[in-house]
Amino acid sequence: PPEEKARLAVTAPYNLDAWDGYFAEREILYGTLAKLKKKVVVLAGDTHNAWASDLSSKDGVLVGVELATSSVSSPGLEKYLSIPMQQLQAFEFAFTSLIEELNYCNLNQRGYLKVHFTAEQVQADWIFVDTIKNKEYIVDETRSHQVILDPTLLPISSLKQKQTA
């Protein structure tokens, strides 16, 4: 229905302890980066979940990307919001659909982020483990994101699952 779509069009800060909670300061920083014609790659991890986001000004100017690692042992958003395990994928889909800048989120896997920088690109690989409670565990290395380091900071592959043999 139209009223449901209208509700989704309303933009409001959803995490006041992140970029959207510091609107004025963020816009000053983004404006400075735009004037200097600099693109940034921000590494984060305090949310304890894996994310990949575009960093864009209120005018839609892309100034960089943010790559966030999950925690290894601390709970993340899924725990704080009491999201049932069977609904996590639906929440992840909703987040990436409703939060325009968000390219990827993983609300339940624990692990770390490995980032490789070259003069041409940034390669981000999320490494997840299925448990930290046992000496034996399964490693999941299927999520990655690449960004070309040119003036547009163009993603060369949207967040994808790596093909495994």
Residue map of PLM features:
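Long, structured stretches of catalytic cores involved in phosphate-ester chemistry, encompassing
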Residues: 1-165
